[in-house]
Each structure stands twice: as structure tokens, then as C-alpha cells.
Amino acid sequence: SVVKSEDFTLPAYVDRRDYPLPDVAHVKHLSASQKALKEKEKASWSSLSMDEKVELYRIKFKESFAEMNRRSNEWKTVVGTAMFFIGITALVIMWEKLY
């Protein structure tokens, strides 16, 4: 089987708060329903339902600003790892003092 690599000469999609409008859309290959929705988008937006507007947004963007600004739990991993190594160091020091 042949592995197809991505063409890195083309612009890539990225969610960033400091660069809010990426060069390309999040969804590159539209399904039939998404294509129909994109055609419906060309008409009046007042005829679109809220769910259709959200779906159009999700075609263009992966995350909203609220989702990008959401806190992560990465700090728990960092603190846990630091405490683990502090504990190992304490055990080594206690072992050295004992022997």
C-alpha cells in the first residue's frame, strides 16, 4: 500500500487566538449535505436555522473562541510529575543518610 503524505506547500488549518481567520477551512472535503448547505448559504442568511449556521461555522472552524480559551488540565500532570521526582529525590536522600 502507498502512504499519501500531506502537501506542506499548501496553507494549513490551525486554531489560534492570535490568528483568528485561518487561510483554509477546517473541513477540506465536503459531504453532499455540507455542499448543499454551502449552496444554501449563498441565499439570505435569515432563511437559515441556528443549527445550519452552527454547521456552517463548523465547516470553516474547528473550535470557537470559547473552546480555545477553555482551561486545560495539563497543570495537574506537571504538578504530579514534579511531586513524583521530589518524592524519589527525598527517598534517595533518606536512603543515603541511613546507609
UniProtKB/Swiss-Prot annotation:
According to its UniProt record, in which pathway does this protein act?
Answer: Energy metabolism; oxidative phosphorylation
Locate the Phosphoserine modifications and list their residues.
Answer: S31, S33
Report whether ATP-binding shows up as a keyword of the record: no
Q: Which residues cross the membrane?
A: 74-99
In its UniProt record, which GO terms are filed under biological process? mitochondrial electron transport, cytochrome c to oxygen
What keywords tag this UniProt record? Acetylation, Membrane, Mitochondrion, Mitochondrion inner membrane, Phosphoprotein, Transmembrane, Transmembrane helix
Q: Which residues carry this modification: N6-succinyllysine?
A: K4, K35
> Which regions face the Mitochondrial matrix side of the membrane?
1-73
Identify residues that carry N6-acetyllysine: K4, K28, K35, K42
Where is this gene product found? Mitochondrion inner membrane
GO-annotated cellular components: mitochondrial inner membrane; respiratory chain complex IV
Its main subcellular localisation, reduced to a broad class, is mitochondrion
Q: Which Pfam families match?
A: COX4 (PF02936)
Q: How does it sit in the membrane?
A: Single-pass membrane protein
Oligomeric state and interaction partners are given as: Component of the cytochrome c oxidase (complex IV, CIV), a multisubunit enzyme composed of 14 subunits. The complex is composed of a catalytic core of 3 subunits MT-CO1, MT-CO2 and MT-CO3, encoded in the mitochondrial DNA, and 11 supernumerary subunits COX4I, COX5A, COX5B, COX6A, COX6B, COX6C, COX7A, COX7B, COX7C, COX8 and NDUFA4, which are encoded in the nuclear genome.
Report the protein's function. Answer: Component of the cytochrome c oxidase, the last enzyme in the mitochondrial electron transport chain which drives oxidative phosphorylation. The respiratory chain contains 3 multisubunit complexes succinate dehydrogenase (complex II, CII), ubiquinol-cytochrome c oxidoreductase (cytochrome b-c1 complex, complex III, CIII) and cytochrome c oxidase (complex IV, CIV), that cooperate to transfer electrons derived from NADH and succinate to molecular oxygen, creating an electrochemical gradient over the inner membrane that drives transmembrane transport and the ATP synthase.
Similarity remark: Belongs to the cytochrome c oxidase IV family.
In Swiss-Prot or TrEMBL terms, this protein is called Cytochrome c oxidase subunit 4 isoform 1, mitochondrial
Q: Give the originating organism.
A: Mandrillus sphinx (Mandrill)
